Amino acid sequence: MFASTLRKTFVFLGLATYSAAALTTTSNSTHYTISNSRFSVAVAKSNGHVVDANLDGQDLLGPLSGNSGKGPYLDCSCTPEGFWTPGAEPALVNGTDSTGTPYVGVIMTDTYETTNQTLSQYLFLRGEETGLHAFSRVTYYNESDYFLRGLGELRTLFRPNTNLWTHFSGSEGNYGPMPLSSTEKITVQDATTYLGDTTDDPYVSQYSDYFTKYTLTESWRDHDVHGHFSNGSTSGDGNTYGAWLVHNTRETYYGGPLHADLVVDGIVYNYIVSGHYGAPNPNLTHGFDRTFGPQYYHFNSGGPGTTLEELRADAAQYASPEWNAEFYDSIAKHIPNYVPSTGRTTFRGKVNLPKGAKKPIIVLSENEQDFQLNVFKKDSLQYWAEIDGSGAFTIPRVVKGTYRVTIYADEIFGWFIKDNVKVIGSNAHTFTWKEETAGKEIWRIGVPDKSSGEFLHGYAPDTSKPLQPEQYRIYWGKYDYPSDFPEGVNYHVGKSDPAKDLNYIHWSFFPSQGNHLRNEPYYQNVNNWTITFDLTASQLRNTKTATFTVQLAGTRNANGNSKWNPDPAKYNNLPWTVNVNGIYEDTWEIPYWRSGSCGVRSGVQCQNTEHKFVFDAGKLRKGRNEFVLSLPFNATSVETALLPNSLYVQVVSMEAVSVSNDMRVLVQAFMPLVTWGTAVEKRVLLTGIVSVSAMAKEDYPMISRPCPRKGGTRRRKKERKKEGKKQGRTVLDALLQRSEQDSFWSRFCRSPIESVAQYVYGQGSTALRKKTTDNLVRVVCVSDTHNTKPNLPDGDILIHAGDLTESGTKEELEKQIYWLDSQPHRYKIVIAGNHETFLDRNYHSHHGNERVTMDWKSLIYLENTSAILDLGAGHQLKVFGSPYTPKHGNGAFQYPRTDTTTWEEIPKDTDLLVTHGPPKAHLDLGHLGCRVLRQALWEMESRPLLHVFGHIHGGYGKEVVCWDLCQRAYEAIMDGESRWWNLCVLFYCWILRLFFDWTADGRATVLVNAATVGGVRDLKRREAICVDIQAGSKRFLSGCT
């Protein structure tokens, strides 16, 4: 149990008043002062914060007032209560590095006692340098509360309280004068103000009428330095000054080169971690220990005529990971987790690029993970470099290890992805990237450059102000969509201009919330975009398949910036629909974890994602063709701050292609980031992800819904699987983006007898007996949690039917065991699933690894074994568990579908049966269950009272089987046997069930598919399923979900 107050701790590593070469350290009762001949800082003994910084006699911070007038200092959004600014008495260290240069370090570590998490800040002054080298460390060790929360924000701030600083500089082309503190401000949305009434403010006259810190956001790819500039008009000596944050390393940031974040306003930021623009955050779980940095706060000065550009260039010379490498090696002993040069190497090589590739870049990042989401491993690192004209690249000082390589370039669709690339020595690597293509390109809109900046109000300069900032940087409400597109978007390929005729945001409606220029929302001609194009007969000749590919630069779903906690909102996953010539329609549900505030926060490059719409080329025609791209009408989100409530997407680019014979017609699209929604209900997918259903027809009154062609669903699944392999997605990604279950009408068009049989049989398959209160035993059933931890209701017996993990690692398994062990249920039964490769002896023998035993704590782990559960009063239940499923892919615990011996070990007196997979045709979407298992149950003399399984996520639910003629007929139909005759039998039995309770004599078995994290078109959130058993009679009673 931790105390309820903050504990201030420090390690005194060496404190003295000394002078080594040009460095001097002094102290008094309240401060330590560290200085060289030009630069000095004062550090408060009470909290370790820098409260004074002086360069050449000029005060850079001003007086201390709260959190102003100090820095760099550290804070975070990381505690259960929210933000925390740590502070503790610091320790000083000193020494001489390998070059003979002296240094002094200030180390502050503070512990948040109620959670036992720590923040540490390390600041070093070296020799005659006029700046501070900064590292930050976060730890969380707390076995009693394994998961604390996400690390929402972590940042260091240089926060002056002085009028010295006259200008901001975000990047080389984005700078301007600071707004005056006296300027009248009108709040127009969260963190955004209108200053235009004060026309003599230099910011207003030169840069913009609106101010928000998001205007000064920069993308990490080319970013080197940002900060404050003083033009000399406010300095004591008339000289110019600069305060800069230098990105000399970027390996410990997240999100790769596509990440963008705040850099400067009245504060010089170092945003180490944030959720801005949909960026993911790492989770603080027991054992989290990560050091970020180094970065370098540099302070410089020049004569009265020195320009901002000159001081900026002086700081930018340090933006190299090779700068000061010897120094960082020397102080590594003071910096936990920092890897010195002995553990680093140079990653170099050559890329054979597709023709036409511009601005190619190579990225090293967390293995087997999209670099935009590289927060899952606490030691995740990232590096990137531009690829030159010859295809060569060099990345110095890479920590040795195994990485994912990602390559992308302007003008080229898709990505090159290769996992398990070992960076150990300095050997050259060679990669060959072939552009994705499905045939001959018909048309292209936009440039695939990972941003929506080329469209209206994107990168084009705002010529109304002398400094001409890019339009997207300015408050979005300035650009009135109804005025720009009074008739909506109607874009004709070959005639329209992308810079004028497509907006940088595709709204579901144009909002008035957060828009001080409009009192009412505008709905007309907003959510549907129309793209028209002409085709000739020769372009269509001998074509079979068309593919329309869309790449998004960002999307705003109802989930907002939340990544791992799906919101139960209607448009959590955002549907984007393409209608082709009014005769074909397909919907892409944009997953919630790609959502973020992008366009409304002055962004054109956020979470990139893409999708291919594949359809029959026969839907295209000679002459005029029309695509309608639709967001649901009036799709909204709930906003707790003053922000627009309209959902949107922003498109990167689009392309259309056709091919002959058996090859496909490819239509690829890259457009501005836009989002759309539709009538949706929630359902839980892998890792607790909430998804949505297909849109209801009434949401799109002008779009018809044709009966799909036979085989269309299989074809789309195949294409999406193929796409996932090309892009190096994880199994999780593929599952999350797989096709939805079709509607009853769609299934009826494809297989009328089977669909009718499913409907009729389903009407009577969930009836349960009325509940009594005598000797009740509650069984709580879950399965396929895949690292998630759903809320579990109270009960007597907890059953987990496998797939506890996603990747099958020991670390993942231990976390799930820890979670299940903490549950209060008397008995906790667990089996493995096909994801638990760590537990499968055969899997390890085939892959050259050795299986290690697990500590199951209070859990009863069954692997083709039984256990007796003593319920008291002479009542017992026998439970048998098996992890095995029919062969499918390369998972664990699999057997050939032709094997008839697997289920012979089930004891005849089994009361509770737990298998990972279902018997075929029962709670078995896609008919992937086991026919042999089903037959084994038929042959048992005394069938189980309860059978719990998972594996088939879309089959979630419960069913009562009575082992009767009705069930025989239904199963025969599902197996394709005498379908018409068995359908008649099924109707006959269904009529009888209207009048008789077929479960009254206890012959029935309750089947439960408890897959909590998914389901193809099952539209309810996955909770545990409960079944009550009357212990004395061993009869099931009504249950709960």
Curated annotation (Swiss-Prot):
Q: Which UniProt keywords apply?
A: Carbohydrate metabolism, Cell wall biogenesis/degradation, Glycoprotein, Lyase, Polysaccharide degradation, Secreted, Signal
Query: What one GO molecular function would you report for this record?
Result: hydrolase activity
Single GO biological process annotation from the record: cell wall organization
Q: Name one Pfam family in it.
A: CBM-like
Q: What is its EC number?
A: 4.2.2.23
Reactions listed under catalytic activity: Endotype eliminative cleavage of L-alpha-rhamnopyranosyl-(1->4)-alpha-D-galactopyranosyluronic acid bonds of rhamnogalacturonan I domains in ramified hairy regions of pectin leaving L-rhamnopyranose at the reducing end and 4-deoxy-4,5-unsaturated D-galactopyranosyluronic acid at the non-reducing end
Q: What class of enzyme is it?
A: lyase
Q: Which GO terms describe its cellular component?
A: extracellular region
Q: Which residues are glycosylated?
A: N28, N94, N116, N142, N231, N283, N528, N634, N864
Localization, per the record, is: Secreted
Record's InterPro entries? Calcineurin-like_PHP_ApaH, Carb-bd-like_fold, Gal_mutarotase_sf_dom, Galactose-bd-like_sf, GH-type_carb-bd, Metallo-depent_PP-like, RG-lyase_II, RG-lyase_III
> Which range is the signal sequence, renumbered to this chain?
1-21
Q: Cite the residue spans of the region called Disordered.
A: 703-728
Q: Which domain of life is it from?
A: Eukaryota
Q: Spans of biased composition, class Basic residues?
A: 707-720
Q: Which family does it belong to?
A: Belongs to the polysaccharide lyase 4 family.
Q: What does this protein do?
A: Pectinolytic enzymes consist of four classes of enzymes: pectin lyase, polygalacturonase, pectin methylesterase and rhamnogalacturonase. Degrades the rhamnogalacturonan I (RG-I) backbone of pectin.
What protein name applies here?
Probable rhamnogalacturonate lyase C
Q: Tell me what organism the protein belongs to.
A: Emericella nidulans (strain FGSC A4 / ATCC 38163 / CBS 112.46 / NRRL 194 / M139)
Q: Which gene encodes it?
A: rglC
